[in-house]
């Protein structure tokens, strides 16, 4: 018993010592001040890609905020007009890429404006933490400069935000991202190499980045095939930093598509399943069937989320008969409930097919070319929904949780292909991350963690070139 008692005593002693010693934080000013002030020709411009919900959406015809502000006058999806603004249109037999509406992305959502009832005038922090990190490295933000928020005295911009319509197909964003990459390179002064950019991408933005690196501006073909994997986008990127990206999906996306969501109870309106179900990108955040993250509660067998008949059988999302009222709001010019349901099921099928196509494109094993460094920042200290069981009536229950950031599991961020199969030593992933940093923060807290700031500044300012 003596060795056991001694071991327990030692552990208690170490624990007490740890409790009595406040954690030290690195003096980032002392570490990076010199590098930040010496803006040489070898510094790459940086692009910031937000995740789902991370871009402000507006209606230019009415000047109304569609997403990014819950002030009075903003689109309210609880009303018929507001629901039509927030949702994407649905048209029978028309490819998703050809379906357009009046809503446009404006800027990255650095803060979220709230002006409702008791919360009048409150601003909720969103992507401001990434911008603060880059500001600490003396990066000059184009959006802040052009808006007049900061006067850079005519100096060239070195930081560029990538606002995009996060409702639409993820692969569709690659073309606009490529245009911004070329804009950022062209903005650099004479004498600069103008060859590479660095990109920091949060959450779903990392999936946009992963697709762009592999396929450049080429969208997914309409016939369901895959484009040539030529790493065209990687030619323009030196450092790709993914933060909390659900590369293998998240069961929470299914929950939202089935049940709808209120993003901040008492603050925001309710987004009904049919409104969210009109958005192809949310389906692209679903977990893979082969990973068995969604199972039949009675048999334990994986549920095929990419088969439209599954959604009809369980009455999920756009296939839910109880969504008839919302569909009437979304499709006011379609006279009958039967026609509206047919259009909704057609849209559902197209979204599921596009999601499966995107997954094949980014899951394909491939080695990145020399000159590209991919890094991952992920959380693994919070119990995160990992497996959902489907009851016979189609309702969902979280069957198990796993380490993550409370939104994205550790294994999803890693794109660990061992999930759902027998144990194998070492992570098996097509993502090829050179560096991985695990933090104890939650999903949005990752970008305000001092270790994140330290890691990003080192990577962008001091890390030796390949």
Where are these regions (language model features)?
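Positively charged n-region of N-terminal signal peptides that target proteins for export
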Residues: 1-4
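Generic detector of short alpha-helix boundary/capping microenvironments
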Residues: 7-8, 228, 365
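N-terminal non-catalytic accessory region
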Residues: 18-200, 204-279, 285, 292-306, ...
């Amino acid at each position: 018993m003596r060795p056991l008692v001694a071991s327990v005593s030692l552990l208690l002693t170490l624990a007490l010592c740890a409790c009595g010693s406040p954690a030290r934080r690195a003096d980032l000013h002392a570490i990076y001040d010199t590098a930040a002030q010496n803006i040489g020709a070898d510094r790459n411009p940086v692009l910031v890609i937000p995740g789902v919900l991370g871009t402000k959406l507006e209606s230019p015809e009415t000047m109304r905020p569609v997403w990014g502000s819950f002030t009075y006058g903003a689109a309210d999806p609880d009303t018929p007009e507001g629901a039509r603004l927030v949702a994407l249109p649905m048209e029978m037999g028309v490819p998703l890429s050809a379906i357009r509406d009046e809503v446009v992305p404006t800027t990255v959502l650095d803060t979220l404006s709230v002006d409702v009832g008791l919360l009048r005038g409150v601003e909720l922090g969103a992507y401001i933490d990434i911008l603060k990190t880059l500001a600490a490295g003396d990066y000059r933000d184009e959006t802040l400069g052009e808006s007049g928020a900061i006067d850079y005295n005519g100096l060239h911009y070195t930081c560029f935000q990538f606002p995009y319509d996060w409702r639409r197909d993820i692969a569709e964003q690659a073309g606009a991202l490529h245009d911004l990459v070329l804009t950022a390179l062209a903005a650099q002064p004479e004498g600069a190499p103008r060859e590479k950019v660095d990109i920091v991408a949060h959450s779903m933005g990392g999936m946009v980045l992963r697709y762009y690196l592999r396929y450049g501006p080429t969208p997914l073909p309409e016939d369901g095939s895959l484009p040539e994997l030529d790493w065209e986008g990687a030619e323009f990127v030196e450092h790709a930093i993914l933060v909390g990206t659900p590369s293998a999906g998240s069961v929470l996306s299914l929950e939202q598509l089935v049940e709808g969501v209120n993003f901040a109870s008492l603050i925001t309106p309710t987004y009904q399943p049919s409104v969210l179900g009109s958005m192809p990108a949310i389906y692209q955040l679903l977990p893979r069937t082969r990973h068995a993250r969604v199972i039949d509660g009675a048999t334990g067998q994986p549920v095929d989320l990419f088969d439209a008949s599954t959604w009809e059988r369980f009455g999920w999302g756009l296939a839910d008969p109880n969504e008839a009222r919302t569909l009437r709001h979304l499709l006011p010019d379609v006279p009958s409930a039967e026609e509206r349901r047919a259009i909704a099921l057609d849209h559902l099928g197209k979204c599921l097919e596009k999601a499966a196509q995107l997954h094949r494109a980014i899951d394909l094993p491939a080695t990145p070319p020399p000159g590209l460094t991919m890094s991952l920042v992920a959380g693994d200290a919070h119990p995160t929904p990992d497996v959902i069981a489907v009851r016979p009536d189609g309702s969902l229950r979280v069957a198990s949780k796993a380490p993550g950031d409370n939104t994205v599991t550790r294994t999803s961020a890693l794109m660990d292909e061992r999930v759902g199969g027998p144990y194998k030593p070492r992570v098996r992933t097509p993502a090829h991350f050179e560096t991985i940093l695990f933090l104890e923060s939650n999903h949005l807290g990752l970008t305000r963690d001092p270790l994140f700031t330290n890691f990003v500044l080192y990577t962008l300012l001091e890390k030796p070139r390949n």
